[in-house]
Amino acid sequence: MKIPGLRSPHDIVRGLHYFGRMLDKIRLHQRGELPADFHSNLGEGFDKTCVQFLGVPYAEIVEHVKGGASDDETLTWCRWRGRQFTEPDATVWNEFMRKRGWNDAASERLKQRKAEGGFSSREEIQTMFDYIDADEERPLRAQPWLI
């Protein structure tokens, strides 16, 4: 289902994949525009993985975003409040997240999600990010490690 105002997990905010999507979900939820089936997973799944990388509790990020902070302001605040990650740290984070579901511990979950979403025959969906984009009716991004 297409959700206006919700970015792809591939989209990057100041060098980090997924972060902007997490903030979009917070803002959409705050405005009452986030579909109900997303509510139970707020702060869980990839959100939880993201906040663990940042070293800032999800609830604190929610409160910061609710105060009107932009993406850049929120990431600056997270880096001040939480973990002082380096560019190599961000590269490892991005590659881990971007490939999640491709030959790793999340592969079975991806297979299950594809079946639930009616995408079992879509061989080009190789990662969880691919699945999210397909499920939200976005074109898939290139997967250079498969070329």
Task: Describe the residue ranges of each PLM region.
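Amphipathic alpha-helical packing elements
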Residues: P35-R79
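Polar/charged low-complexity regulatory segments
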Residues: M1-D37, F96-I147
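Amphipathic protein-protein interaction modules
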Residues: I61, V65-F119
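Alpha-helix initiation and N-capping motif
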Residues: L16-F19, Y58, D71, A90, ...
